[in-house]
């Protein structure tokens, strides 16, 4: 769990996302409250429940990007899902309890990665022995092994091919569901789970010494790990620190004028209620309590309104944050300020071809103006419009770049107007092209 202060979390998000201070503050406080709860004692810790968040704002203003960046910062089990992917329990499709099962899998992968680092030194020695066995045989004299060990550590044998036995991952085993079987409620059953113990679990692979290194270290690390303890830690991490980001929550609001339930809308809302309030979900790794999982829901709400959600669901999302539509100044900052801004990305991409892009300040102004103009006349898709406009402006350069090695190409306001000016003015054309 991260121990960043709210101010540090906001400044970290500022590196990638322009504006939206209220949303950044809300998620930073929610994340810090997870850490604060961990410092409490006994019964009081159980009583402190997370304050779930509902982010409301037009498309393309940074809701999903905040979730993506938060996932990297959180250092906790984090899952981003679209609410539209689920159907009511009992119908064909994924039910909402799958969210918790997926979150457990994320946590197990995180804990395993962390624990592998603890046993890495021992795993490296064991992996080295397996490579030596493949090179000189298990019965070779100690002098021979030592001479090969020195060569191995010096990197002299990196390109030599060896045959090693590796564990089959079972990735090729198909998954299926058996109606009415308990396993079906716990997610799809893998044929590998049923028949995996009947042999065929390892296979011989021919690899270079260098490429076998990581595979063998991972295998030896997993042998040293206590799987049961690892699973318990992962479940505990989910129950205490888990974060679920529910995107497109507005798409499961009831449609106007529709009578009766709707299995992919109201039905999903009803199924989400106990999950957000706190329930126990069965997974193949054990039961998981959802009382302290933090839920962050987000939606554009350009057709539906937050009040169209079931009243009970609204009550379970007590913190409301409104994200502002992007202004021309925001568009300009998005092009230049973030660490991996669009301008920096395109300049770096062209440099791989030996072409230097010189994008002037007035070109950046022109790009922002075009994006704002098209958003206001066609459909407001926020910052995503910048990608469309940039692609259109640099289309010719991208196509001819391999033939222009060593050139410096100046992109100014006139260049931008020449490529997209007419399209931006013609609403009918921009509807289809921009």
Curated annotation (Swiss-Prot):
GO biological process assignments: protein unfolding; proteolysis involved in protein catabolic process
Protein name: ATP-dependent protease ATPase subunit HslU
SMART domains for the chain: AAA, ClpB_D2-small
Alphabetic keyword roster: ATP-binding, Chaperone, Cytoplasm, Nucleotide-binding
Gene: hslU
InterPro entries on file: AAA+_ATPase, ATP-dep_Clp_protease_ClpX, ATPase_AAA_core, Clp_ATPase_C, HslU, P-loop_NTPase
Entries under PANTHER family matching the protein: ATP-DEPENDENT CLP PROTEASE ATP-BINDING SUBUNIT CLPX-LIKE, MITOCHONDRIAL-RELATED, ATP-DEPENDENT PROTEASE ATPASE SUBUNIT HSLU
Organism per entry: Bradyrhizobium diazoefficiens (strain JCM 10833 / BCRC 13528 / IAM 13628 / NBRC 14792 / USDA 110)
Residue ranges of coiled coil: none
Family according to the record: Belongs to the ClpX chaperone family. HslU subfamily.
Function summary: ATPase subunit of a proteasome-like degradation complex; this subunit has chaperone activity. The binding of ATP and its subsequent hydrolysis by HslU are essential for unfolding of protein substrates subsequently hydrolyzed by HslV. HslU recognizes the N-terminal part of its protein substrates and unfolds these before they are guided to HslV for hydrolysis.
Keyword Manganese among UniProt keywords: no
Entry GO CC: HslUV protease complex
Residues reported to bind ATP: 18, 60-65, 247, 312, 384
